[in-house]
Amino acid sequence: MSKVKESAIVSATSALQPQGPSSSYGLINSFAHQYDRGGANVNGKPSYTVDQAANYLLRDGAAWKDLNKDGTISLSYTFLTKAPSDFYSRGLGTFSQFSDLQKGQAKLAMQSWADVAKVTFTEAASGGDGHMTFGNFSASNGGAAFAYLPFDMPGSHKGESWYLINSSYQVNTTPGTGNYGRQTLTHEIGHVLGLSHPGDYNAGEGNPTYRDATYAQDTRGYSVMSYWSESNTGQNFVKAGGQYYASAPLMDDIAAIQKLYGANYATRSGDTVYGFNSNADRDFYSATSSSSKLVFSVWDGGGNDTFDFSGFTQNQKINLNETSFSDVGGMIGNVSIAKGVTIENAFGGSGNDLLIGNALANVLKGGAGNDIIYGGGGADQLWGGTGADTFVFGAISDSTKAAPDRIMDFTSGQDKIDLSAISAFAVNKLPLQFVNAFTGHAGEAVLSYDQGTNLGSLSIDFTGNSSADFLVTTVGQAAVTDIVV
């Protein structure tokens, strides 16, 4: 590769003095830690890790037994056509059957639980490791629905779930993607499977509020089993004046049900796209326009997977690390990645997006707008798209000679390569000295460019051994003035 000779690009007298971590790195670092769990209290309550929250959801010890020892809980279910014999003695008012819409949405809710754990659901009058039933009631007891935990004792009513429908409450008549009726179905099926509320409260028993929560993450941003708004944990699922809800288990629910019955790694084990151009075959994972409302925690069994949020026009923050949250499509903290899940790629939209990769080789595309992109570890492909984009590197190990990142569309005078948070600059204040070739001094940098191939590179010797400890390659030419330290 030939080296550009212009002094504005490579000169023995060109040097950059460290100015400390930049505002771009500050935004990356702040968002990367915004949803950290454990440790210090949040909202005056203990902050629970995913495992702690999962254990608390399972604290009542209720579970179905694997009767045939095949490693899977197989449940049959029916939609009741008449009230059970003790229905009226329980003060439930008038019985009614599920409508076709309710049946279809209940099946989708069950499917979302089967996706994440070793549980199957079959419509049949009986059979399997246990039986579930669905029905409507009319007498309000303060709750919109209720279900029974699977305790193995006489009169436990395990498997039953009931949904309120009367002249004053119609939400359960129209369940659908992202609405409260669908969330209610998913919540009650969670009880039937063995999950409790994240706190010791129940609808109809006093007037519980978030103040009664045991731990900070007891909100609908983390669990469909919670009663409390996601706003309590700094999230916001409101868009275009409407409140939206998860249609499937969220991060803590997924961890809990997998502790109980095991994880379903067969689910989406190939290359899966979530968001626009989705092939996940689930309504809650699919976006079709910038007005789409996504609220989900992704469970994925393997493959090379992509968050495609390219059709959104709003400013977005996308984090590919497991147990992280992202701000997608104008909402806040509405998309998360379940524990144990790896998503390799992320595509931003036309807003000013912030993208954070993980330790693997990611493909990160900012799209239009002035984007900030941090690949993290691994040999990443970074696309800024149109606009003035900043490519941030926080450690020497983020892009090495053995696994260099490649910036696929660098535009000099517009884009930036931000090295300001690398400790040699941020802490040790090592000047960055541009040279034509390494001479054995720490802090030397070589900018190279081949006009014929339009490929360039930035190599830095941090140890003074005349070898590149840090290497990032570019499609397009970078100048000294494009580097930030």
Swiss-Prot record:
EC number(s) given by UniProt: 3.4.24.-
Residue ranges of Hemolysin-type calcium-binding repeats: 347-364, 365-382, 383-395
Cofactors, names only: Ca(2+); Zn(2+)
Null allele phenotype: Inactivation of aprA attenuates both the capacity to persist in the host and pathogenicity. The deletion mutants are able to survive to wild-type levels in immune-deficient Relish flies, indicating that the protease plays an important role in protection against the Drosophila Imd-dependent immune response. Moreover, they persist less well than wild-type bacteria in imd flies over-expressing Diptericin. Pro-Monalysin is found in supernatant derived from the aprA-deletion mutant while the mature form predominates in supernatant from wild-type P.entomophila.
Gene Ontology molecular-function annotations: calcium ion binding; metalloendopeptidase activity; peptidase activity; toxin activity; zinc ion binding
Record-annotated active site: E188
Entry's cofactor comment: Binds 8 Ca(2+) ions per subunit. Binds 1 zinc ion per subunit.
Gene Ontology terms: biological process: collagen catabolic process; extracellular matrix organization; zymogen activation
InterPro entries: Hemolysin-typ_Ca-bd_CS (IPR018511), Hemolysn_Ca-bd (IPR001343), MetalloPept_cat_dom_sf (IPR024079), Pept_M10B (IPR016294), Peptidase_M10B_C (IPR013858), Peptidase_Metallo (IPR006026), Serralysin-like (IPR034033), Serralysin-like_metalloprot_C (IPR011049)
Induction section of the entry: Is regulated by the GacS/GacA two-component system that controls P.entomophila pathogenicity. Also seems to be regulated by PrtR.
UniProt binding sites for Ca(2+) 4: N358, L360, N362, G375, G377, D380
Chain sites annotated for binding Ca(2+) 1: R268, G270, T272, D300, G302, D305
Residues at which Zn(2+) binds: H187, H191, H197
Residue numbers binding Ca(2+) 2: G303, D305, T342, E344
Residues the record lists as binding Ca(2+) 3: G349, G351, D353, G366, A368, D371
Amino acids binding Ca(2+) 6: G376, G378, D380, D398, D405
Gene Ontology CC annotation, any one: extracellular space
Function: Secreted protease which is important for P.entomophila to counteract the local immune response of Drosophila. Can degrade antimicrobial peptides (AMPs), e.g. Diptericin and Cecropin A. Thus, protects P.entomophila from the Drosophila antimicrobial peptides produced by the gut innate immune response, and promotes bacterial persistence in the Drosophila gut and killing of the host. Is responsible for maturation of pro-Monalysin to the active toxin Monalysin, by cleaving its N-terminus.
Entry's family note: Belongs to the peptidase M10B family.
PANTHER family assigned to the protein according to its UniProt record, in alphabetical order: MATRIX METALLOPROTEINASE (PTHR10201), MATRIX METALLOPROTEINASE 16 (PTHR10201:SF294)
Record protein name field: Metalloprotease AprA
Highest classification ranks of the organism: Bacteria, Pseudomonadati, Pseudomonadota, Gammaproteobacteria, Pseudomonadales
